[in-house]
Amino acid sequence: MDPNRIIQALKGTIDPNLRLAAENELNQSYKIINFAPTLLQIIVSEQVEFPVRQAAAIYLKNMVSQYWQDREPTLGEVVFPFNIHENDRGQIRENMVEAIIRCPESIRAQLTVCLRAIIKHDFPGRWTGVVDKINLYLQSQNSGSWYGSLLALYQLVKNYEFKKAEERDPLLAAMQIFLPRLQQLITQLLSDATFISVLIQKQILKIFHALVQLINNTVMTHWMEILRTVVDRDVPAIWFSECLRGGFQETLEADEDDRPELIWWKCKKWALHILTRIFERYGSPGNVTKEYVEFADFFLKTYALGIQQVLLKVMEQHRQRQYVSPRVLQQTLSFMTQGVSHSLTWRQMKPHMQTITHELVFPLMCYKDEDERLWQEDPYEYIRMKFNVYDDHVSPATAAQTLLCTAARKRKEVLPQMMEFCHQILVDPSADPRRTDGALHVIGTLAQPLLKKRVYRDQMELMLQNYVFPLLNSNLAYLRARSCWVLHSFSPLKFHNELVLRNAVELVKHNLVEDKEMPVKVEAAIALQTLVRNQEQAKVYIRPFIRPVMQELLHIIKETENDDLTGVIQKMICEYSEEVTVIAVDMTQNLAEIFSKILQSEEYEESEDKTVMALGILSTIDTILTVMGDRKEISQQLEGICLQVIGLVLQKPIIGMAEFYEEILSLAFGLTCYCISPQMWQLLGVLYDVFQHDCFDYFTDMMPLLHNYVTVDTNMLLSDPKYLEVIYTMCKKVLTSDAGEDPECHAAKLLEVIILQCRGRGIDQCIPLFVEAVLERLTRGVKSSELRTMCLQVVIAALYYNPTLLIHTLENIRFPHSPEPITAQFINQWMNDTEFFLGLHDRKMCVIGLSILMELPSRPAVLEEVVGQIVPSVLLLFLGLKHIYASRVLNKPEQFGRAQGSEEEENEEIPSDEDEVGEKGVALQPSVAPTGNDNEDDDDEDDDEYWDDEGLEGTPLEEYSTPLDCDNGEDEYQFFTASLLRVQSSDAGWYQSLTSPLNEDQRKQLQEIYNLAQQRRSTGVKGL
């Protein structure tokens, strides 16, 4: 392979004028043996221009990601798909670790992705040598090889981070080699605060973080001291930067936005990340699983106090206005939160708690300069930042809130102290408005514990009236927004004065409709919706204004693209379904325009937020459609708008649009629940085309819509053979293409629905096709009883459709592995699996099928062999049906939840300085604890499986109804008894064969079924 030719092609990809020709050259060359190793040689060569090396690294990364894993041809393909040749793989494996060590940072980033993919597919099977290779450089006295080898080791560790314990053996073996060296290396470097030293330390900590659950008590002590030292040591004021041509830099003069990225703060962040993770997951007695009980006790008593002492120092530094990076502060607060529940750590924390809450937590919860700057420069970005879940997760302010809430709930002195502190601020007319914002933020954060204590709950209405309502008209926009947020937080409060509630609703509505500041409008929208949800009278007050309110909500959504507001508008639509009727079409049109705008925006593909927002818009349209479903005139107008939205998604390539398929299929389902227009029948063909392009993953999402096509307008379905052909072809493709057993169950169910829906409607020509499709699937091995019984059920439905046709079909089906007709195999499988028919519909179908089987005029020979199983199987099915009918009578929907603003006290406080769960701690147990010997009563457990919740409550597929499930559908009790009586009168010998195996209990049960059938016949009532 000529390296110069590849170099020229790579150089061409950087030049827009040469890119197309260069890419064609590379695409014609990449399958040639030695191409990939040549790329790696180019990447590491310092004689090659840097941009070319970068381009080569990106190309190699893409090749490894796509073509490293062995791939077999898919069904129907003749040519084997391209894989990187094994000789080339060997060369890359041999040189990849060295390449990572030698290359600069931007190229390393591409190569580490390559290495992780290689390890994923080749370790340990094809590449056990990677461990020795990394260890060679890690043990080297040449410090220049340490960082690169640690990056390589990190890829190995990350591959195992989330694997089950039993799959981690190769990693455990490797870490026996690496852990001592990692500990030795970081200990050696701790006193060296230079950039490269701390960079290596940080990488060691990242590796350790991914291994935390594997560390035992023996080695933990050394690591705890290392972690404590890293957190405790000072960040150097001046550092020597090799990357900036040897210049000295002052850390304290770095821009504040850049300081968190300094390596010393990153190193502290990872040390704290480890400590917090250990405490939360493994070191907190009473909150750990059984295997960590001993370690949790050991951790709390041995390490927690020493670590917490260091963290108290970190918080004091922040309080004294010394710089602490946001993530370090956030992790510090998270660790302290965990310590609140334990007496040992609480006793150490308690003397400092008032200072922490008043002088550290409180300032974090106040409106800041950076908030004001962002609000003024970009209010929409301010909204996005305030509602971003990830930002919340890593925010010091959120961690401060969590610490405050936990302490207020768990330790009795915290809540009164904090409320008194906030009260003093609120009553002070000269208080800094930002401190007023902080006080309201604290009170809103503590709303839940405040509403649970009568002493505070009774004062909250007055507090809102005196301190919150006036600020809803403040000239400071951030105080108006905060006041709306407080009303949102206290929306469950039981108001004693109706005028106060009315005033709250009116003020919030005014801020929503009239305020000029978008962040205020967003908070007002959320507050109004929660008031309407929690206060019946608020719902009444807003009813006359619902049109301007909804229009304003749409305007805000259009302007801000804030996903939280799509949830608000959906809930308002459900609350005011009648009032929304007159504006439903306009709302849907507006939402469709917003959706189109989002999809066509330039930054759509780069912004995950826009995808989330677009999904929220589709969900809102779906809500309108659901609420308006039975209003025919409106639904017809909505259909055209919805079809435009559906078309917008389906016309684009599946890449980038697939995330919307579930939502647009839900829209199409909503448009077909009551009637199906010609336009919706045309959509079936479009969906079929989409399905053909690897959309098996979405078949289960298509299922409700396909069910509607079959059941809502069966006449139209049967009027044109292509409709039924399309649906059958989709089901057949799912059943023959390894789509997975869940989609296959759905495909079989749809075939059953078609058979039952079209019984007596002349689809005889379809029955052999349907039956052969499911039986062929059965012969290929089935893992789950659900798929097995579902395939059998299609054949049983065909038996119900036309017994003679079904038996004829079975006698004529031959599969390659067996020259015999499949009749005997099918009936034997059915007899063996009757106990796996669960739920009401499936058992009912099985009973009807067995009843028909008993009456067959021309009995297949296999029936003589299984005759003794037929009636006992039916009796077992009726036992299940009896339990289902009884449970449906007993388990009427209950009214859950207590009245809002409950008068009951709920005390979560821990007495005095005790632990939340006792000093020894209690392991978290599974929801059902074993009793006695594990092997005891095994037989009973097997029997009880037949009566588990799934068996009684039905199966998920039962939501796809058939004529059998209607109130006037076939009665299985009457059907079975009538069949057995006809057999008794027409063929006494066969009747004797059917009933003679029954024991006394079974005969009694049979008589009960006769009696119940008679009762149901005379009363016309089903169920018990």
From Swiss-Prot:
Query: Can the keyword Zinc be found in this entry's annotation?
Result: no
Could you say what a knockout of this gene produces?
Answer: Knockout animals present mild to severe dorso-ventral patterning defects during early embryonic development and display severe cardiovascular and skeletal defects.
Annotated transmembrane regions: none
Instruction: Give disulfide pairs as residue numbers.
Output: none
Q: Which UniProt keywords apply?
A: Cytoplasm, Nucleus, Protein transport, Transport
- Region annotated Disordered sits at 896-969
Write down the Gene3D superfamilies for this protein, in alphabetical order: Leucine-rich Repeat Variant (1.25.10.10)
Q: Where is the Importin N-terminal domain?
A: 22-102
Give a Gene Ontology cellular component term annotated to this protein: nucleus
| One term of GO molecular function | small GTPase binding
Which PROSITE patterns does its entry note?
IMPORTIN_B_NT (PS50166)
One short Pfam name that applies is: IBN_N
- Give yes or no: UniProt keyword Cytoplasm: yes
Acidic residues compositional bias, start-end: 902-917, 934-952
- Location(s), subcellular: Cytoplasm; Nucleus
Q: Which GO terms describe its biological process?
A: intracellular protein transport
InterPro entries xref list: ARM-like (IPR011989), ARM-type_fold (IPR016024), Importin-beta_N (IPR001494)
Q: What function does the entry list?
A: Involved in nuclear protein import, either by acting as autonomous nuclear transport receptor or as an adapter-like protein in association with the importin-beta subunit KPNB1. Acting autonomously, may serve as receptor for nuclear localization signals (NLS) and promote translocation of import substrates through the nuclear pore complex (NPC) by an energy requiring, Ran-dependent mechanism. At the nucleoplasmic side of the NPC, Ran binds to importin, the importin/substrate complex dissociates and importin is re-exported from the nucleus to the cytoplasm where GTP hydrolysis releases Ran.
Q: Which family does it belong to?
A: Belongs to the importin beta family.
Q: Which PANTHER family match?
A: IMPORTIN-7, 8, 11, IMPORTIN-8
Protein name per its UniProtKB record: Importin-8
